[in-house]
């Protein structure tokens, strides 16, 4: 049985004071982590505030990126070793914005995934296609390729523990949402790809999120699909009431 995982991705929003105000508003209102795992991915400057809060609450913390080396002369990068020592649980890697604006490659993402596991955290590995690729009928092949490259040389145990987020680029921040059937179709392809690379047992354990204009209004329908185990939520996670509606979608 896969535990649902709803993760808010704040992107480059909220300072530490705004973070504390958000946390004060959700205090004591999150579901038990055994029912739905609630996660917030936040800018590095907010992580210490989140980690301190999470010690007494049903919340897990995620960084929005990390480097693939533990330390060294890499100005501006975030050390996975330091994130782990800080108490961070997850790291989002391969987000379409990182790929588009910062030139991240599948090889970079694979190296980051290994570094995250080596530092006892779990990657949330993002994948997804552009509108042009979808209209050309290339979605399944493209996403399967991204997953194959991202998981290269990871152990079966590591892959089983991973979270994979399908985020159709054409549905991020555009107001367009993949229908629940479209989202399920690609999430099924992701699970099939993992089964081919490893085996069905591993594929049945990996948790797959959908990310692309997820809101309280559509979360229950998405979560009703067989291969969708969670959401990676952008804008709708910035408001505490909206975030609470999302993580408490079961009622």
Curated annotation (Swiss-Prot):
Its EC number is 5.3.1.1. It is found in: Cytoplasm. It catalyses: D-glyceraldehyde 3-phosphate = dihydroxyacetone phosphate. Keywords: Cytoplasm, Gluconeogenesis, Glycolysis, Isomerase. CDD domains: TIM. InterPro entries: Aldolase_TIM, TIM_sf, TrioseP_Isoase_bac/euk, Triosephosphate_isomerase, Triosephosphate_isomerase_AS. Substrate binds at residues 9-11, 173, 213, 234-235. One of its GO terms (biological process) is glycerol catabolic process. PROSITE patterns: TIM_1, TIM_2. The active site is at residues 95, 167. GO terms for cellular component: cytosol. Pfam families: TIM. One of its GO terms (molecular function) is triose-phosphate isomerase activity. Pathway: Carbohydrate biosynthesis; gluconeogenesis; Carbohydrate degradation; glycolysis; D-glyceraldehyde 3-phosphate from glycerone phosphate: step 1/1. The keyword Cytoplasm applies. Homodimer. Involved in the gluconeogenesis. Catalyzes stereospecifically the conversion of dihydroxyacetone phosphate (DHAP) to D-glyceraldehyde-3-phosphate (G3P). Belongs to the triosephosphate isomerase family. This is Triosephosphate isomerase. The lineage of its organism: Bacteria, Bacillati, Bacillota, Bacilli, Lactobacillales.
């Amino acid at each position: 049985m896969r535990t649902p995982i709803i993760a808010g991705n704040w992107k480059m929003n909220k300072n530490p004071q705004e973070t504390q105000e958000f946390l004060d508003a959700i205090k004591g209102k999150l579901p038990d982590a055994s029912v739905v795992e609630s996660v917030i991915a936040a800018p590095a400057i907010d992580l210490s505030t989140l980690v301190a809060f999470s010690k007494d609450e049903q919340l897990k913390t995620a960084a929005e990126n990390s480097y693939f080396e533990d330390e060294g002369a890499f100005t501006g990068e975030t050390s996975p070793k330091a994130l782990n020592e800080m108490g961070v649980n997850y790291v989002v890697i391969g987000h379409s914005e990182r790929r588009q604006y910062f030139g991240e490659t599948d090889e970079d993402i694979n190296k980051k995934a290994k570094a995250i596991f080596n530092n006892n955290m779990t990657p949330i590995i993002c994948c997804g296609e552009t509108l042009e690729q979808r209209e050309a009928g290339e979605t399944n092949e493209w996403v399967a390729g991204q997953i194959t490259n991202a998981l290269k040389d990871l152990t079966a145990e590591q892959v089983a523990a991973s979270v994979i987020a399908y985020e159709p680029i054409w549905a991020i921040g555009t107001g367009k949402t993949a229908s629940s059937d479209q989202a399920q179709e690609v999430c099924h392809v992701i699970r099939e790809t993992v089964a081919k690379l490893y085996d069905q047992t591993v594929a049945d354990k990996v948790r797959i999120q959908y990310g692309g204009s997820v809101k309280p209004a559509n979360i229950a329908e998405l979560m009703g699909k067989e291969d969708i185990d969670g959401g990676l939520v952008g804008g709708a996670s910035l408001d505490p009431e909206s975030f609470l509606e999302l993580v408490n979608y079961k009622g």
